[in-house]
Amino acid sequence: MLKTLLGDPNKRKLKKYQPDVVEINLLEEEVEVLSDQELRAKTDEFKERLKNGETLDDLLPETFAVVREASKRVLGMRHFDVQLLGGMILHDGQIAEMKTGEGKTLVSTLPAYLNALTGKGVHAITVNDYLARRDAEWMGQVHRFLGLSVGLIQQSMSPTERKKNYACDITYGTNSEIGFDYLRDNMSTSIEEVVQRPLNYCVIDEVDSVLIDEARTPLIISGQVERPTEKYLDASKVANALQPEEHYEVDEKARNVILTDEGFVEAEKILGVSDLFDPEDPWAHYVFNAIKAKELFINDVNYIVRNDEIVIVDEFTGRVMPGRRWSDGLHQAIEAKEKVEIQNETQTLATITYQNLFLLYDKLAGMTGTAKTEEAEFEKIYKLEVTIVPTNRSNQRQDISDVVYKSEEAKWLAVANECADMYEVGRPILVGTTSVEKSEVLSKLLLERNIPHNLLNAKPENVERESEIVAQAGREGRVTIATNMAGRGTDIILGGNAEYMARLKVREYLMPRIVQPEDDNPLSMMQVKLPEAGSQGFGGDGQQKGMQRKTWKVSPEIFPTTISKDAESLLKEAVNAAVKQYGEQSLPELQAEDLMAVASEKAPTDDPVIQKLREVYNLILEEYEAFTSKEHDKVVERGGLHVIGTERHDSRRIDNQLRGRAGRQGDPGSTRFFLSLQDNLLRIFGGDRVAGLMNAFRVEEDMPIESRILTSSLENAQKKVETYYYDIRKQVFEYDEVMNNQRRAIYAERRRVLEGEDLKERVIEYAEQTMDDIVEAYVNPELPPEEWNLEQLVDKTKEFVYLLEDLEASHIADLSMPEMKMFLREQVRIAYDQKESEVNEMEPTLMRQAERFFILQQIDMLWREHLQQMDALREAVGLRGYGQQDPLIEYKSEGYEVFLDMMTAIRRNVVYSLFQFRPQRQPEPSEVA
């Protein structure tokens, strides 16, 4: 009703951008006639106009027209009008919802260029290193062509490289790298070690994945703490001996376990202790973690065991996350369960959530194919509006209604049969599964039916081939099984991705000749042997024996055709030229990848080697496209890509992402979900009602049912889960907001010290406040002066400032409390000047160095302890909800007290340390006769 009266709010939003779109299109003819040099000169002209008082909004139409023209020349891609709209939405600091295949990556070039003109830096953020690298290489060409510098942050980079890349106009990187660099910068001990500039503007690709899916996971930098390994092993034995229902209950929804009274008795009996909560010998924490590890953390679902280590699997992307560990002893409990080496527990040194990290930017924007379902959360927490950008071509995807089976076994058989039917007609199929284990169940069923397929999951032997598999997933009769759709970012193009194949072919010849062998190459990961031609995507044990040598050989079936003799001889010639210029096996892998990336770009280059490689790349591309375009038409005729979902995800948004793989850019396609009553979503959130229906209808195991009631039950279950998780994220945000204010205060203080701002004045201020604290501790203004404890006051002052050893109680006996404070402040200033001249006799700037050292040392040490205290406080206030108190209000007020105590301790410790500081002269090295 309201929509009819007021009109669609989304359309109203888009309407206000329309005049700018018209203006950009009118400017197109003007910029088309400019030479490359003149187009590049526009960048300096825009910067000059900004200096002279014009705003970014004033420049928007012209800058967008210039970027569009540069993109046409360099990439051969012209921004559609809807992409211009997307760019304006991003420039306004909003979220642009754009469907898969609508060119989100190209859209980001528009606001990135415009905002980079200020010189304050722009961050383009993606979810993994591979995508960051791809975008920096691919879209970076446009920016480089226009004279802007482009940086890239990768996990393996040194601090010097990071600093150089952050100093660029536009920097591509992942959310986690940006976050960890922010934390590391705030732990550095000199300003030279700081790599980031102040956070200005950022565009996040897959913004829902970063700001919502990852919002519950804080980024943590930690140090190691010794803990007894035996406790984890004993607790694991206890967990195995205890029985569910009888000794403990599992709350899957809250991912928690609760011991029953019998459970407590049994656990205490096995361990031979009288109380699990005994503060002298606490066991409860270990036992709870061991039961969680047994019941809630499943091998091949939540983690995999690789090289005798527990490696976490990201529940949203299905990717492994090496190096990440669960905190609070949980990781150790899982190590004990799997009988691998138990590593030391860690102590948090610095932490931040993505929610608060991205709110540090002056302006934030993002793009995704699916944001509308989470619009309320984006607006409430991040103050980000969501605007839907219309598609360039109408959507032809057909979403077939879900089918539900009674048992999981029947569901998997039905999925395998559906794959067989589609394979028969030659349609490509993408099957989304929710765990490594389930993808392998389906793989076995397909092998029994002799259906060749590719497996894409967190297993190491499949990860290496991720983008290669996705790039081919749209070819005729291809069957791809993907866990949680890892590989987001590589488009599934019907008929196959010719550009990617041409790059693979050139790499296959070039890389073995110019890349250093593995043991000389510190940056490369452990490599995986690729399967031989004709295999089903299983690479044996995924390891090569002997010395780790990377294999660049690609399975021949990846390519649509063998390259012509001419192309092959040109390719060998180009590779020889590269070897001649760079040397045989002499480049680190990252550098070689850069060379390969530039060779497959269109940006102008004077390098003869790159020109040769580019010439042969384009020739191979042409040969491949002749095949892929025919195959594209064939696949379109047969109905396009068919996407099969095998379980509804907790969130409708993730389901929509999987569906969005089919029917990109107006192509045909279809999607269907196959479900069972044993699926987690139905089991945990509302399966009883559905099971009741099934039993009432006496449905056979293998008989599918499709019904409106079922579909609405599922939708309701998903809404319940979404609300549940939103509440958790909101709570995380509200609690972290308290920490965030403290973090900002402490990091701002730290940065001022690092930059060496007024160090002496700061320490004198600390010393004066410490004198005030001492007076307030020993002088009670409500008592008569003769009862004031002046002897102790003087002793305490001397304890802090030994240079005031001549101070007597009689010197202050006749003073009022404010006069006493003034007197001691003056004394401490004189003492500090005396201390400074003593220290500086040894080296003129030594006192400033000492000030910086002691302040940073105390801030870091006490902040670490403070983080632990705040964690303990958060757990403690959680219990107060039972006593009718609001835990959040309690946490805020007590957290503030704890913070003030820490700030006081920092001041006092710094003053004490500096007055105690007595530098020693280094003895001169004696001359050897």
Swiss-Prot record:
InterPro entries: Helicase_ATP-bd, P-loop_NTPase, SecA, SecA_CS, SecA_DEAD, SecA_motor_DEAD, SecA_preprotein_X-link_dom, SecA_SF2_C. It comes from the Bacteria. ATP binds at Q83, G101, E102, G103, K104, T105, D491. Keywords: ATP-binding, Cell inner membrane, Cell membrane, Cytoplasm, Membrane, Nucleotide-binding, Protein transport, Thylakoid, Translocase, Translocation, Transport. Its main location: membrane. Its EC number is 7.4.2.8. It catalyses: ATP + H2O + cellular proteinSide 1 = ADP + phosphate + cellular proteinSide 2. It is a peripheral membrane protein. Gene3D superfamilies: Helical scaffold and wing domains of SecA, P-loop containing nucleotide triphosphate hydrolases, SecA, preprotein cross-linking domain. PROSITE patterns: SECA, SECA_MOTOR_DEAD. GO terms for biological process: intracellular protein transmembrane transport; protein import; protein targeting; protein transport by the Sec complex. GO terms for cellular component: cell envelope Sec protein transport complex; cytosol; plasma membrane-derived thylakoid membrane. PANTHER family: CHLOROPLAST PROTEIN-TRANSPORTING ATPASE, SECA INNER MEMBRANE COMPONENT OF SEC PROTEIN SECRETION SYSTEM. HAMAP family: SecA. Monomer and homodimer. Part of the essential Sec protein translocation apparatus which comprises SecA, SecYEG and auxiliary proteins SecDF. Other proteins may also be involved. Belongs to the SecA family. Part of the Sec protein translocase complex. Interacts with the SecYEG preprotein conducting channel. Has a central role in coupling the hydrolysis of ATP to the transfer of proteins into and across the cell membrane, serving as an ATP-driven molecular motor driving the stepwise translocation of polypeptide chains across the membrane. This is Protein translocase subunit SecA. It comes from Acaryochloris marina (strain MBIC 11017).
